[in-house]
């Protein structure tokens, strides 16, 4: 996941969300929208329950992982200098069923090295219960993305 453009902080979240929905349509499908973007941190909300539920009316784990990947990737991106980046690893623990939207997902950089950054994330439901925790690693490719 990469923005493909150089934007500064604070970012115009409306423009970032518009760009994201155009270039990564799954975010629009999930009702995903960034609400916070600061150095080493990103938060978003999404209400995917009607589009991405499994039997029993529970939010699908793949939707949770997608929201974590996007948000944690944005947290890593805030420390990037405009180069492309990729997810190397993403480990998710599902702690509670996701049944109460809207869901809030946040990612926070834990450590940044030269080309590798470690990010932690979590998803909460409308009642503030943590439904998933994650730890991931992103790799900066050192190549510019046109966009």
UniProtKB/Swiss-Prot annotation:
GO molecular function: fatty acyl-CoA hydrolase activity
EC numbers: 3.1.2.-
Alphabetical list of Pfam families matching this protein: 4HBT (PF03061)
Entry keyword Hydrolase: yes
Keyword Hydrolase assigned: yes
Keyword entries, A-Z: Hydrolase
Xref: InterPro entries: ACOT13, HotDog_dom_sf, PAAI_dom, Thioestr_dom
Top-tier EC class: hydrolase
Family designation: Belongs to the thioesterase PaaI family.
The name this protein goes by in its record: Putative esterase PAE1329
